[in-house]
């Protein structure tokens, strides 16, 4: 009987690997016809044999995806999550978020700043945390995690730094390692907070756009001019998957975003096959 169980498990694994190979062939053919530079990675955390990717080490401007690195660094730090910081701690910036609408004397806890940084992609909250942690410490944490191509070199919305060549960079491979680091440490209180924050992401207009609302995707989105990114970890009854898509050098954000929505729908439906 034990041999029968082993044989059945091998058959299931082989079937899933065939499904993944077919998915990879489809995705490769599809994205290579698209405008811009596309990278993707899909990885089964319970069965690493189910891994497919394309251009996984291609360097992209990180946009807001770098905020997940800041979140992980915060969890590993000794900063008190309950400490409150004035929102005037750094200069106010444009872009997404809620803090810029608040009175200048408002104080917000570090935990709330982390939530705003991810859930609403709040740039002011992000910059406060970058300054509080120290940009060099965030980079050092990336290096510690062996995120070989990851660079954090500027604050959010610092276009002058960008013009000078100081940019934030990620690959889908490094971002995948970062997600797995948070996932693997979610049993620790501080990392569990990060894990739950990622699940409350409000921007579901890319990879999970056509997924049911009750499907939890622990993820982050990122956007700059001609850049569209999304990536996270899906926990489903058919498996736990890291699903990441980065797109840069697009001719149009709108078109790139629509293509990512299509890819997200196709990937989910394909993985859900029995």
How would you label these PLM feature ranges?
Residues 1-19:
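Short, Lys/Arg-enriched N-terminal segments with co-localized hydrophobic residues
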Residues 15-34, 51, 132, 183-205, ...:
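Structured C-terminal helix/loop/strand segments within mature extracytoplasmic catalytic/sensor domains
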Residues 36-59:
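Short, conserved catalytic-motif segment at the N-terminal edge
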Residues 37, 128-180:
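Mid-domain, small-residue-enriched loop/turn segments at the edges of structured enzyme/sensor domains
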Residues 48, 61-87, 243:
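Active-site SXXK
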Residues 72-79, 119, 131, 177-184, ...:
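Short glycine/serine- and small hydrophobic-enriched flexible loop segments
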Residues 84-96, 133-134:
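Acidic helix-start/capping segments at beta-turn-to-alpha-helix junctions
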Residues 93-128:
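Conserved catalytic neighborhood of penicillin-recognizing serine enzymes
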